[in-house]
């Protein structure tokens, strides 16, 4: 059942090229995420029945935001949602999924290298059908809408199971939980000479990849250790954590 929820604008929802970034506690305000997402939908045309991609870097609030956007996509008339397993999709992986499956667009939940956790940062970015960030004309329209929004649409539905690959339905909209890594790994195999790199590892080459408990971990495990034959343990800190293991996930802090 679709609910139309009355709301009032927030004055601070101006997105940049990297989307809307604020502290987690700002996003946790009642209606804050919903207002911004509805403002994005209200600024777009022609998405009825189309496909929307959703995923993020696994930081604190990621899973909750995914569930909200799924229910709002159903209420606003999307025909299908593709969401990464566990709510995980790196920014380039999300871009690839949008392009590969001909999606109308997608939401990427990330604040890049900014710290994660209940007292740290969160972000929402909308990417268009070419996989890239929304252009200024779209972000300006979104900001204008955030200043006048009076209601948003959301279906009353249970949370979907984000951890099991497969399909389900939310208020008549198809939701597919997909392997977060498979399509991106396949793209990398098209772009790079995997047999040559595999031979390099087979010859004794060693490296250590520190994923910093952030989103790259599952991709690094699959590509380096499973597909290229690097020894188990090549990837360290490879499980995404909501607070990135209490570390700042930036390899260039100096």
Where are these regions (language model features)?
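Gly/Ser/Thr-enriched, mixed-charge loops and adjacent short helices
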Residues: 2-10, 31, 118-254
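Glycine-rich phosphate/diphosphate-binding loops that line cofactor/substrate pockets in enzymes
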Residues: 37-52, 194-202
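Short, highly selective alpha-helical patches that border small-molecule cofactor pockets
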Residues: 33, 37, 62, 66-70, ...
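Short glycine-rich or small-residue beta-strand-to-loop segments that form or flank ligand, phosphate
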Residues: 23, 51-57, 127, 206-210
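Positively charged, low-complexity intrinsically disordered leader regions
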Residues: 1-37
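N-terminal small/polar loop signature for handling phosphorylated ligands or for N-terminal nucleophile
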Residues: 53, 58-120, 222-254
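Short, glycine/acidic-enriched loop or turn micro-motifs at the edges of active sites
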Residues: 21, 60, 213
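Phosphate/oxyanion-binding active-site loops and adjacent basic polyanion-contact surfaces
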Residues: 28-37, 41, 61-62, 90, ...
């Amino acid at each position: 059942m679709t609910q139309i929820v009355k709301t009032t604008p927030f004055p601070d929802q101006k997105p940049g090229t990297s989307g809307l970034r604020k502290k987690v506690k700002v996003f946790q305000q009642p209606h804050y995420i919903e207002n911004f997402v509805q403002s994005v939908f209200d600024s777009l045309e022609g998405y009825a029945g189309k496909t929307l991609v959703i995923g993020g870097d696994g930081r604190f609030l990621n899973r909750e935001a995914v569930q909200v956007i799924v229910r709002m996509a159903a209420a606003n008339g999307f025909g299908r949602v593709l969401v990464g397993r566990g709510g995980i999709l790196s920014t380039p992986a999300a871009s690839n999924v949008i392009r590969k499956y001909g999606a109308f667009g997608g939401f990427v939940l990330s604040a890049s290298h900014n710290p994660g956790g209940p007292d740290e940062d969160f972000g929402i970015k909308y990417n268009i059908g070419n996989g890239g960030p929304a252009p200024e004309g779209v972000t300006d329209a979104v900001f204008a809408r955030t200043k006048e929004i009076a209601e948003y649409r959301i279906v009353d539905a249970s949370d979907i199971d984000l951890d099991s690959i497969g399909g389900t339905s939310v208020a008549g909209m198809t939701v597919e939980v997909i392997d977060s890594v498979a399509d991106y790994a396949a793209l990398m195999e098209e772009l790079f000479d995997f047999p040559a790199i595999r031979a390099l590892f087979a010859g004794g080459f060693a490296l250590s990849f520190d994923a910093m408990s952030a989103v790259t971990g599952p991709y690094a495990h699959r590509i380096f250790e499973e597909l290229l034959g690097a020894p188990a343990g090549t990837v360290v800190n490879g499980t995404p954590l909501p607070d990135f293991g209490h570390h700042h996930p930036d390899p260039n802090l100096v």
